[in-house]
UniProtKB/Swiss-Prot annotation:
Its EC number is 5.1.3.9. Signal peptide: none annotated. This is Putative N-acetylmannosamine-6-phosphate 2-epimerase. The keyword Isomerase applies. Pathway: Amino-sugar metabolism; N-acetylneuraminate degradation; D-fructose 6-phosphate from N-acetylneuraminate: step 3/5. The keyword Transcription does not apply.
Length: 227
């Protein structure tokens, strides 16, 4: 098991991301958000873009799972979709690279080609497969990813409306049984109770984003509850 994954075993990773259209979009703010997460006990940070990661790395000494979200014409894959994004992340010295490992059409290289290229050029970095189905998890495991995450359950056209926590984390349990790599619970982990249930279901660790780092999303849940 990769050293980064050992540090995250049975612990919380906080996703600190704010896209351009969001109020907290700022590398400085994401660095502060990561510091707050560390002070709260997080064991790692997931972050988007070279700029944000450099700021976070200068602010906290936690392992960083890096992604670059970038859209390409004719493809629904936007999480670290090509080697261009991988190179940017390595310039920020990330500890782990997460990428879309779904069966959706890719903009350039195949997933297998990307994994081979990364292993050749950057052999020390850990790789996380963001998947949406059991089939994708099994394929990612075959390709040699260091860990597999349920990040994209509900976010592909063929899993729309689904969540990793559905049916008492049935999908996550199936993945844990079917693959050798550790499985990370991520996506719509909106409460501490859900996060705890994910670990009980066999998750190696839990990634929580919006429920901690997106104030507009948190506010909306309160507003809707009062209506």
């Amino acid at each position: 098991m990769h050293a980064v994954l050992k540090k995250m075993k049975n612990k919380l990773v906080v996703s600190c991301q704010a896209l351009e259209e969001e109020p907290l979009h700022s590398s400085f703010i994401m660095g502060r958000m990561a510091l707050a997460a560390k002070q709260g006990g997080a064991s790692g940070i997931r972050a988007n873009s070279k700029e944000d990661i450099l700021e976070i790395k200068s602010t906290v000494d936690l392992p960083v799972i890096g992604i670059v979200k970038r859209h390409y014409p004719g493809s629904d894959v936007y999480i670290t979709a090509t080697m261009t994004e991988v190179d940017e992340l390595m310039e920020a010295n990330v500890d782990m690279i997460a990428m879309d490992a779904t069966k959706q059409k890719r903009p350039k290289q195949s997933l297998a080609e990307m994994v081979a290229a990364i292993r050749n050029q950057y052999p020390s970095v850990a790789l996380m497969a963001d998947v949406s189905t059991l089939e994708e998890a099994i394929e990612a495991d075959r390709l040699g990813f260091d860990c597999i995450s349920t990040t994209l359950v509900g976010y592909t056209a063929y899993t729309a409306g689904a969540s990793a926590s559905d049916n008492d984390f049935a999908l996550l349990k199936e993945m844990v049984q079917a693959v050798k790599a550790p499985v990370i619970a991520e996506g719509k982990m909106n409460t501490p109770a859900l996060a705890k249930c994910a670990l009980k279901a066999g998750a190696h660790s839990v990634v929580v984003g919006g429920a901690i780092t997106r104030p507009q999303q948190i506010t909306k849940t309160f507003v809707e509850a009062l209506q």
